[in-house]
Structures are given as structure tokens and as C-alpha cells.
Amino acid sequence: MKPICILLSLISFTVPLFANPLKVYLLVGQSNMQGHAAERTLQHLDMDPKTAPLLKAIQNADGKAKTHQDVWISSIDTSVESGVKQGQLTVGYGAGGRGVKIGPELTFGITMQQHVDEPILLIKTSWGGKSLNTDFRPPSAGPYVFNEKQIENYKKRGKSLTEARKEKAKRTGVYYRLMLKHTQKVLGSIESVYPNYNTKEGYELAGFVWFQGWNDMVDGSTYPMRGQPGSYDAYSKNLAHFIRDVRKDLKAPKLPFVIGVMGAGGPIAKYGPEKQRYASIHGEFRKAMAAPIKLPEFKGNVTAVFTENYWDEQLSELVDRRGKINAKRRELAKDQSLTREQREKAIADFTDKLFSKEELKILEVGTSNAAYHYLGSAKILGEIGKAFADALTKIH
């Protein structure tokens, strides 16, 4: 009897711990999906009791970033020679270029793995400055059609409408196809990213997150009535086409889909006087982004995350207040009677009046980029990434 028990014990250790299909999540969009939060801004998470637990999941006690053994990622990164960065999830899968950056992928991967409690794979395809109306335009949306105002402007400038249409056609859908190409390449060789991939069990496309929008929102040529009711209806229609086409092309008809609704600047209801001129544009665009979730075919399988809810109002106000220092510096620069030392002292005194030491610390560690990149804040993008994972879990 004893030899049989030993044999059974040995067999049990040879069975893969995870016999389910590998869950694969697709993260797609433009610069905010890339992520422009410098690694140093992670410190800000620890300054808020609500986000401190996220930092513990990201860093070890010594402050060094953890490598997450059960989360694997393949990410487009044009700053490296191969054009792709892949491996186990850690910091550094944000936008390429200067310094280590993070995007929503970090806390998304951490949170999603906690939800499913098994290894997962992330495939991230994002490029800065790309629109849905042209760059990511899905096949079923048809060709880009110039509106009457655009045609009129071409005629006024003596430009060839025929050439403009040819040029637009060349650009149309390029990044939709690149997204598919990279995704299908990874899915065809998962073991090159995740060495322990069980080919017998295969994979499951378990979720898609779309975080894009800025280039469409600011495009007054494509959306000439922007800010008025219904002015971004074309975006809603294109996004619905996008969801359908992605599901068709990836042979995943019920692929759970999260729309990350643009929210840089925070809730519109909290906009101060200086931001009111943007309120109608931001408001109408956010409505248009979320609109597909109301379609009957998407009920229960497409949801929206309003990223405005994770905007840091305190951090934003501190950044706005810092603008007064820059204005003061320009004012002092005009006074030729002051020495350099006197100007520096005047700025230091002015800063001390404007900020407490704690506020200066928050400002120092909390931001690394502009407002349209969510202030380059790991705290904001960290909460957004977690929200994406939580939202997917609810519909999958």
C-alpha cells in the first residue's frame, strides 16, 4: 500500500497547479494607457490612507518595486529597439523614453491577479496621440468622410481634396491593425512571454480595456460642433463598431469590455471659473464615450469607468497654485534693480506664504506631467488601473 501512496503523491506534484485556460487581458489606447507617471510619484500613494495599501502591493518594505511572479505582460514600447517590452509585471511598463514610468497596467495587473488568483497575461498596445476617428478606426466604421466644413476649408486654402482623401485613407485604421497584429502575434506564441504556459489548456480572452479619447475630444475639424449636445455622436458610433470588430477579429463574441472614460480635470461639477470654458466640451465627450454601454447588445458585457472619479483635487489645486509662483518669477525678472540673490529670496518667501511644508512635499512627489496626462500621478493612474480591474471582474 505504501508504494502506491508514494506514487500517487508523486503524480499529484506533476499536475499543473493551474489547469484552467490562461486568462488574457488586452489594454489598448493612447498616451494615458501608455502611462506618464514617473516612478517617484508612487510615494504619494503612501500619503493617503485610501491608497497606501496599493503602494504595499507595488513595493517591498525597502521601497524597491516588486516583480509580480504571476502577472506577465507584453507591451508595445517604441523606445526600445525591438519595439516590444515583455516579462513579469513591475514598474517600467509605462510610456517609454526618459525615466521609469507606470500606467494603468501596473495596478490593473496586480488587482486582476488578486481577483482570479491564478497567473494572467496582459497584452498592452498603446501609442501616444492617436484618434479613434482615424488611427484606431475599425473596419466596419467605413472610410473617414470629410464633413462640409472641412471640404470648404480645403477649397479656401486651394488644397487638393483628392490628395487629402488619399492621405487620410493611408492613415485610417493603421493602429487598429497594429493592435491586432501584436495581439495575435503574442497569442500565437504565449510561451515566449509566459514560459509556464500550458498549451493543452490554452487561453481565454478574459477582458479588454479601452483608454483613449484626448485626440478626438480636441479635434475641432472632425467634430466641428464640439461641446454642443450630440456633437460627439460619431465617436460613440465608431466605438461601438470598434467593440464589435475587435470581438469578431479575435473570435471572442462576448469579450468583456471596459471603456475608460476620459476624466482629466476631474468631475465637471467641480470645475472652477478658469475651467468653465472647457466644461461643455469635456461633458459632451464623456457622455459620448460612455454611450455604447446603453446599447442592448452590450448590456452586461460592456461597462464604463468614469476616471474623473479618481482625479486628485488637492494635487490639482496645488499645481494651479504653483502657477502663481511662476507668475511672480516673471514679474521679478522684469525688475532690473534686483540681484539674483534678492529674486531667489523673494521667491522663497513668496513660496513659504503660499504653501505649507506638507503641501510642498505633496507637490514635489505627486506630479510628473501635465493635467492631460493625469498630472503624471501614480496615485491617480494607480486608482484608475485598479478600477478597470474591478469593473471587469463585475461583468466577467
Label every PLM stretch briefly.
Residues C5-P16:
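Bacterial N-terminal signal peptides
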